[in-house]
Swiss-Prot record:
Lineage of producing organism: Eukaryota, Metazoa, Ecdysozoa, Nematoda, Chromadorea
Name of the encoding gene: rrsr-1
Leader sequence residues: none
Assigned keywords, A-Z: Nucleus, Ribosome biogenesis
Record localization: Nucleus, Nucleolus
Protein name (database record): Ribosome biogenesis regulatory protein homolog
GO CC terms in record: nucleolus; preribosome, large subunit precursor
Biased composition (Basic and acidic residues): 278-295
Gene source species: Caenorhabditis elegans
Chain residue ranges for the region called Disordered: 227-248, 271-333
One Pfam short name: RRS1
């Protein structure tokens, strides 16, 4: 395959931004866009590299590099540029004294094993923490004390001191980076403000924070006088499929005992709702029975009245006959 020429000519000058390695081809596409697209991309890339190699060059360890000029196009960013952090206390001191950070070797020669080992970390060389013997210095105040424990305590103090310095540096940086602006205490989607939460909400928040550990709060130490964690839910435990008969009998007896000991709970609202229609029905039936009873009595009275009237008529007719007969007898006499 023959080498292609590095000379590229364009009818319309392209826009080249070497700072962003941006190449904009302004020539219009004629005909089918898919045809000759690879050739066009090759020429544009070649022209971009031709402009790059026209910059100032220098050699660094068998490699030729160039320094790109400032960008002409300002590319949009999702977030603003990070601000320069406040130097730490040690960085300020090192700058004043002219102390430069020296790069330490990753490996060190271990005199005990005569091998090269990592300077730090696991199986590091010249590890004094694994010494089985510590030489007592001549100026020791108490030669009988535990020098191994003293070395461990000193290491703990150094770690605590470094951690304290780190926290101070973070606090110093926060004072410089935090800007005054609108209050961010009430943010959308965050929930209720901490000052406006109720006692129960705060308690639940504390319990959730305690459970948000690798051990689900099992090894979380509590404060003095702090209440126990609120159990918002219990894990359901199932009984074994095969269990002895004695245990089943005891469980059945316990259930029966609980049922006997429990008193029936009467809900007044439900009882009134159930008893209301029954009471109305009973009163209605009583009123109807009273009406029937009154009506029955009146009927009996009416029947008795008619019967007495009929009997009275019969008695009256018989008496008049007797009186007439008596009168006739008296006249004859």
């Amino acid at each position: 395959m023959a080498d292609k020429s590095t000379e590229v000519e364009k009818a319309i000058d392209p826009i080249i931004d070497l700072g962003n390695l941006l190449f904009i081809d302004r020539e219009p596409i004629q005909g089918d866009a898919s045809e000759g697209l690879e050739e066009r991309a090759r020429k544009n890339t070649q022209l971009l590299f031709n402009n790059i190699w026209q910059l100032e060059q220098k050699r660094v360890e068998e490699a030729i590099i160039v320094t790109l000029p400032p960008a002409t196009y300002r590319l949009p960013r999702e977030k603003r540029l990070p601000e320069k952090k406040e130097p730490t206390k040690w960085e300020k001191y090192a700058a004043e004294k002219g102390i430069e950070k020296r790069k330490k070797d990753k490996k060190v020669f271990d005199e005990a094993t005569k091998e090269w080992k990592p300077t730090y970390g696991y199986r590091r060389g010249n590890d004094d923490t694994k010494d089985w013997l510590i030489e007592i210095p001549d100026n020791a105040e108490d030669p009988n004390k535990d020098f191994f424990a003293e070395r461990r305590e000193k290491k703990k103090e150094r770690v605590a001191k470094n951690d304290m310095q780190r926290m101070k540096n973070l606090a110093r940086q926060m004072k410089t980076t935090v800007k005054s602006g609108p209050s961010t205490e009430k943010m959308i989607g965050v929930g209720v403000d901490a000052k406006e939460k109720s006692k129960q909400q705060v308690r639940f928040a504390v319990d959730r924070a305690k459970l948000a550990t690798a051990s689900a709060g099992k090894f979380q130490e509590g404060l003095k006088g702090e209440k126990a964690n609120v159990k918002t839910g219990k894990k359901r435990k199932f009984e074994a499929n095969e269990a002895p008969v004695s245990g089943e009998k005891e469980r059945a007896l316990q259930i029966l005992q609980r049922m006997k000991s429990k008193k029936a709970k009467i809900v007044e609202e439900k009882a009134a709702a159930v008893a209301g229609p029954l009471r109305e029905k009973k009163e209605k039936s009583e009123r109807k029975g009273a009406k029937d009873q009154t009506r029955q009595k009146s009927q009996i009275h009416r029947q008795q009245w008619f019967k007495n009237k009929v009997d009275g008529k019969k008695k009256g007719t018989g008496g008049a006959g007797k009186k007439g007969a008596n009168k006739a007898k008296a006249r004859k006499g």
